């Protein structure tokens, strides 16, 4: 099955690239990774299979300066390259940390290209932590509104809800790593359903039927062991703050 379904994960902007690099490091397999950024210095070290420096003439590879409009225009400047890397895919996940310039602005353009190319297009994004400021949150909310119009299914993970599950003494760097881990779980959870045989047979047609033009979706995480593990894990996932 993994050879039959073409799955690609596109990380947009610094947050999206950090997320896909974390996925690669943790061994998410059966997918192709694509990194997109306006900041060449942040793009080049990425572990992604494909890297696209968008808006070269507009930003000279120096980034979007936290301006989503620059991110959007840069993606439009490079739309032929973006279209090429998503064409032929069955499923395209588009991930970003909403609130910055490149991720917020480019993610809707990337998703639009993927959907036009015929892929099931799933957005998986985070909203900023409260300590990142109101401007970043406002940018994120505007970006999510635009993004939601371009994807089949959108999963939004509020970082402030995530932080309520973490140690109050956690460092900012570790908090961002935890956000990357949640993005990994969201994407791996769906891709594994498609590529990994299980006790209940779910094929790509089933997934597509549920997720095509589905709108907003929610995810929860639960873990358990022992005799009632399925019920306990299910209840934990349902009540998960994220």
Task: Please give the residue ranges for each predicted region.
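Tubulin/FtsZ superfamily GTPase core signature
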Residues: 1-242
